[in-house]
Amino acid sequence: MNLPEINTSLFTRLRFILVETSRSGNIGAVARAMKTMGFSDLVLVNPRFPDALTDAEAVALASGAQDILSGARIVGSIAEALEGCNYAAAVSARLREFSPPVTTQRAIAGQLAAGTELHAAVIFGNERFGLPNEIVEQCNVLINIPANPEYSSLNLSQAAQVVAYECRVAALGDGQLASPVGF
């Protein structure tokens, strides 16, 4: 069976940035979410613990995605994390009075997959407070995952999984969604 050609460039053009993550397990779980969807560029901005990438909880929750952890970078500022990117999308459950245009993960995924000139970053805040306004205001868009309005706060790794999945679907296009049988 000949499968149609797919545009895999989004898999190398999309960076996941975690800002001030406080639980190393969430970093490992994000690495796993990224790897299952074909992404590998992970950058941490000032994680709570300096050994967050090698911590036992991170390694355990990465569950086979240790290569993503070992390839990740730790930087001291959002400016450093965004080096090489020309498009940034903040991810937040909290809408702001003043923010960039609000979109969904599905809409932005399609835009990123189609825009081969875009070297984009999706930026996730910490588990307790999310992203500070100063970072959101630097972004081109604010992704608001349309969750249950009565309880819209996803775990960090769950939000990353939703965004990674939508980006994968957009990159693969129609007819490429089936995975091979087996593990």
Model-identified regions with their sequence ranges:
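Post-transcriptional modification and biogenesis factors for structured RNAs
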Residues: M1-F183
